């Protein structure tokens, strides 16, 4: 089991430095000719892509922040949404290359969205895009909306998690 703590571990964000490093490599530059920072960012980016590809199962847990996924989760998704590695372009459109994997997305929401929020749809959409067809979702919802039911809502989520765990 490999655990990534997105706010503790180094997750490179796509920025000007990373883009210019990739551009230099595409133009024929040697990896060692890039700045040390570019080399580190590109190496880490590739390491995270390879880690994702090597995993049999993917579990993503996040809170809904301002009706979206946390920014570090978006940065991680950039490392697993890579043309030529996790998907390819065909004459019929993009095709996912990551097959035979399962994913579980666990998300806590202060309100109740029943999977209709943008964040959970984005997570499932990106995983489907790269070829992961089985994406189970577990929502821990409504605790901010109805704090008097917090224990009950948490127990319901734990029961659902136990049921999902049997087939995951």
Segments predicted by a language model, with ranges:
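Short, glycine-/small-residue-rich phosphate/pyrophosphate-handling segment
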Residues: 90-131
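Residue-level signal for short, function-critical loop segments
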Residues: 64, 109-111, 141
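A generic local structural motif
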Residues: 44-47, 89-93
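Hydrophobic/aromatic beta-strand patches that form the interior of the parallel beta-sheet core
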Residues: 2-4, 59, 104-106, 136-138
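Conserved nucleotide-sugar donor-interacting segment of glycosyltransferase catalytic cores
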Residues: 73, 77-92
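Glycine-rich phosphate/pyrophosphate-binding loop and the adjoining helix
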Residues: 114-168
């Amino acid at each position: 089991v490999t655990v990534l703590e997105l706010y503790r571990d180094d997750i490179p964000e796509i920025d000007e430095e990373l883009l210019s490093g990739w551009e230099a490599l595409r133009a024929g530059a040697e990896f060692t000719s890039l700045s040390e920072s570019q080399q580190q960012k590109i190496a880490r980016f590739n390491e995270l892509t390879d880690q994702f590809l090597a995993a049999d199962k993917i579990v993503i847990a996040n809170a809904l922040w301002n009706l979206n996924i946390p920014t570090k989760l978006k940065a991680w998704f950039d490392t697993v949404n890579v043309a030529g590695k996790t998907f390819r372009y065909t004459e019929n459109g993009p095709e996912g290359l990551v097959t035979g994997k399962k994913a579980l997305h666990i998300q806590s929401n202060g309100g109740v969205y029943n999977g209709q929020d943008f964040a959970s749809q984005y997570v499932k959409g990106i995983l489907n895009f790269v070829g992961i067809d089985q994406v189970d979702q577990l929502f821990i919802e409504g605790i901010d909306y109805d704090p008097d039911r917090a224990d009950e809502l948490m127990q319901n989520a734990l029961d659902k998690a136990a049921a999902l765990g049997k087939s995951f």
